[in-house]
Curated annotation (Swiss-Prot):
CDD domains: Ribosomal_L1. NCBIfam families: rplA_bact. This is Large ribosomal subunit protein uL1. Pfam families: Ribosomal_L1 (PF00687). SUPFAM superfamilies: Ribosomal protein L1. Part of the 50S ribosomal subunit. The gene is rplA. Belongs to the universal ribosomal protein uL1 family. Signal peptide: none annotated. One of its GO terms (cellular component) is large ribosomal subunit.
Length: 224
């Protein structure tokens, strides 16, 4: 839904669209022009210079968590299933859980599977793929290290990826958070993003960076 309305336009008028702000000033500005009562999410939008064959995707744990704990579903059997339960997975199973999802169960946020389960889990591709939840080695969600994976997910491990237009949208905090903590989350995200520069890319990797709140206008960042 397009952002509009009197309060939005008032907030927009306080943003100099001809200026690129340093990240600290941008965060302060977003807090200053906030006009809604709920606790908005602070988002970063990065436009990358990528070729069609380039993939930019990574997982990370931000230093300061702000999202609710994810409901973890694990496909595993035997001892691995017991391990998943022991370390706090919300749902654990094999064929029974596969059938439950086929029947419409969707009360989970992330899916992990042991490698031996993937032949059967693959049948859920049309369902899990649509939600971006299909286990994948690139996101470390196909693994036998259930203890480590569940622990990192509970700490808030999350993923960023560039879409087909070379844009990454990533959340780094809430408007109620201390500005320093938002900045540190932003720095961690940018650090990990820059590590994913394609090795064969010539020229600029990051074209532009903007930050915004859920309902507020975007602010361009002076990114060098």
């Amino acid at each position: 839904m397009a952002k509009s309305g009197k309060k939005y336009l008032q907030a927009l008028s306080k943003v100099n669209k001809l200026k690129s702000y340093n990240i600290d000033d941008a965060i302060s500005l977003l807090k200053e022009i906030k006009f809604v009562k709920f606790d908005e999410t602070i988002d970063v939008s990065v436009n990358l210079n990528l070729k069609k064959n380039h993939t930019v995707r990574e997982t990370l744990v931000l230093p300061h968590q702000f999202m609710k704990e994810k409901r973890i579903l694990v496909f595993a059997k035997g001892e691995k299933a017991e391990e998943a339960r022991e370390f706090g997975a919300a749902y654990v199973g094999d064929d029974d859980l596969i059938n439950k999802i086929k029947d419409g169960f969707s009360d989970f946020d992330v899916v992990v599977a042991t490698p031996d389960m993937m032949k059967d889990v693959g049948k859920l591709g049309p369902i899990l793929g649509k939600r971006g939840l299909m286990p994948n080695p690139k996101t470390q969600t196909i693994t036998n290290d259930l203890k480590g994976t569940i622990a990192s997910l509970k700490k808030g491990r999350t993923e960023f990826r560039a879409n087909k237009n070379g844009v990454i949208n990533f959340s780094v905090g809430k408007s109620s958070m201390d500005s320093k903590k938002i900045r540190e989350n932003y720095d961690e995200f940018i650090k990990e993003l820059l590590k994913r520069r394609p090795s064969d890319l010539k020229g600029t990797f990051v074209d532009s960076v903007y930050v915004s709140s859920t309902m507020g206008p975007s602010v361009k960042i002076d990114f060098v």
